[in-house]
Amino acid sequence: VGSEMCIRDRKYGTCERVAIGKGATAVVRVAHKWDRTEEKLYAIKEFRRRRKNETEKEYVKKLTSEFCISSTLHHINVIETVDLVQDENSHWCEVMEFCAGGDLYGAIKKGSLTAPEIQSYFKQTVQGIHYMHSMGVAHRDIKPENLLLDGNGHIKITDFGVSDVFRMCWEKSTHYSKGLCGSEPYIAPEQFECKEYDARLVDVWAIAIVFYTMQLQELPWRAARMSDPTFQEYVHAYASSATPSPLPNLSPRDCRPLLKKMLAPDPKQRCITDDVLKDPWLSQVSDTAKPS
């Protein structure tokens, strides 16, 4: 293959050999395409070969399901998915817009995020998820690694591998979701305990954990289970305290009531994205982060 890997029919240019992202199911590379005098960049998600215990039909269904979800979503805070193609080695590849700023995990690790950036990225994530929920889709794997920065002050939600359609466009009622998925520190408590759950509320929980992590560069607890002492203490203090520990660590003070509602251990008490966006504190937060 040499130092470059070309996508079938050169529609999206040539891929760099070095990956910009690696996950359990795929590798992501940058593709360069010259269009007259302008260079266009795409992110190419190259899916790994199917597992031995998976049929070809199951494998293709999984890939096309993810593409069918992601390609119908069009919002400033959701990654734009362009195409699903095969390369010359018959690898399935998803073509997406390229984000020059890397992922939020890298930005948190660097420790360079300002308070206005943190608040704006939080609001933008809520807006992106609110849009997805309005389309009947829950993400179910919100974490810093799945939030990309475009370099112009916008956050983009990516990776719809475990997303769930909880309401078809012709339906009025929502379906409950099943299955434990996502990364343990961001998983809502009901996912550990219940067979079925409202996936919208799982997303709300995860966004709140991301906000905490952006601010403090650490997680509030290892897992939202009663076997975790920090989480157990939080649950016991929740009913009696206006700001149960560790929420007093968050600033400004005005954000704490909202975060408490988003991190309600009982999903019946947790707020949905409509309520989050109506919060007086969040209403005055900017939709765009000015890059530091």
Report each predicted region and the residues it spans:
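Glycine-rich ATP phosphate-binding loop
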Residues: 27-51
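Short, small-residue-biased leader/transition segments that mark boundaries at the very start
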Residues: 2-6
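C-terminal lobe of the eukaryotic/viral protein kinase catalytic domain
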Residues: 87, 218-267
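Short beta-strand micro-motifs within the conserved protein kinase catalytic domain, predominantly
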Residues: 80-90
